[in-house]
From Swiss-Prot:
Mg(2+) binds at D188, E216, D241. This is L-Ala-D/L-Glu epimerase. It catalyses: L-alanyl-L-glutamate = L-alanyl-D-glutamate. Keywords: Cell wall biogenesis/degradation, Isomerase, Magnesium, Metal-binding. The keyword Transmembrane helix does not apply. Pathway: Cell wall degradation; peptidoglycan degradation. It comes from Thermotoga maritima (strain ATCC 43589 / DSM 3109 / JCM 10099 / NBRC 100826 / MSB8). Its EC number is 5.1.1.20.
Length: 345
């Protein structure tokens, strides 16, 4: 009764509450692919892919075009053999977000068959996590207003997007710190700086007495030497995001001693590689945060359960659904301000 009898993909569009601006990109909507896995028992498991051309080279149209191929890959397999399904979907090399969605939908269906939740299948290490909330690139004045609003909403970790104007970025962080005292800051350049600019930014902020908890992806993804340079010349811990898409990327980063943190995103790695990265981190002393692309509440649900289950993360950047207009909340978790916890069955 636990065998897969059908797999369906469908396009979903979500409008942002306001345009979301990061280095080199402004988004007004998120176009995602919803995955539905149907079992012979009638149980349905759900996942969501939020493809990024900028990070993964994925297009929504390409994901939808391989619906039949994905269906053929896993139809007839019992979801209790989820490791087998993971192994098969690892072959979706060019479609990491779809791989993540199919793998989670498999676990979602299995958890329903077993009368439990995905976070418990993954270990059940934590009952609650706390997310940050993001300030996109804007004028200094607007960034400060947004950060103050986020702080007043109860968020104590604030993510600040930078990378397009060094002088304004330094000023924005300084002014944000004045109105959000007691908050922790994750600063994300999204590959926007050169090595020299990245170090200049970090030192300027440090000299103003501002502490940054995580300095994320300051340089280009392929510039591993640059990440290492910034790490050893910056007063703040450096994280890889775009440079860390697969477990093999992370192994190289560890070998090169290039970063202090890696930002796991299921949309980059799928569940299978994400689990491997957790093991690599635990073995090497690498610290972890977990992030997102443009997922709705259905997609963020995947990362929330992964984080609750593994308990592997120091920081949680799971706020994309808070920026989108959704008619119905579809996460199997309770959102209480920044806190996210398991929803009772």
């Amino acid at each position: 009764m636990s065998r897969i009898v059908n797999v369906k993909l469908s396009l979903k569009r979500y409008e942002y509450e306001k345009p979301f601006h990061i280095t080199g990109s402004v988004s007004s909507e998120s176009r995602n692919v919803e995955v539905e896995i149907v079992l012979e028992s009638g149980v349905k498991g759900y996942g969501e892919a939020s493809p990024s051309f900028r990070v993964n080279g994925e297009r929504v149209e390409a994901l939808l075009a391989i619906e039949n191929a994905v269906r053929e890959m896993i139809t007839g397999i019992d979801v209790r053999n989820y490791a087998r399904i993971f192994e098969i979907t690892d072959r979706l090399f060019g479609f990491p977000s779809l791989k993540a969605a199919v793998q989670f939908a498999t676990l979602d269906a299995l958890s329903q068959e077993l009368g439990t939740q995905v976070c418990y299948l993954l270990g059940g290490k934590r009952d609650e996590i706390e997310t940050d909330k993001t300030v996109g690139i804007d004028t200094v004045e607007n960034r400060v207003k947004e950060a103050k609003k986020i702080f007043e909403e109860g968020f104590r970790v604030i993510k600040i997007k930078v990378g397009e104007n060094l002088k304004e970025d330094i000023e924005a962080v300084e002014e944000i710190a004045k109105v959000t005292r007691g908050a922790k800051y994750i600063v994300d350049a999204n590959m926007g700086y050169t090595q020299k600019e990245a170090v200049e930014f970090a030192r300027a902020v440090y000299q103003k007495g501002i502490d940054i908890a995580v300095y994320e992806q300051p340089v280009r993804r392929e510039d591993i030497e640059g990440l290492k340079f910034v790490r050893f010349h910056s007063p703040f811990p450096v994280a890889a995001d775009e440079s860390a898409r697969t477990k093999f990327d992370v192994m190289r980063l560890v070998k090169e001693e290039a970063v202090d943190y890696v930002n796991i995103k299921l949309m980059k790695s799928g569940i299978s590689d994400a689990l491997a990265i957790v093991e690599i981190a635990e073995s090497s002393g690498l610290k972890l945060m977990i992030g997102c692309m443009g997922e709705s509440s259905l997609g963020i649900n995947q990362s929330v359960h992964f984080a609750l289950g593994t308990g592997a993360f120091e920081f949680h950047d799971l706020d994309s659904h808070l920026m989108l207009k959704e008619e119905v909340f579809r996460g199997k978790f309770i959102q209480d301000g920044p806190r996210m916890r398991v929803k009772d069955q």
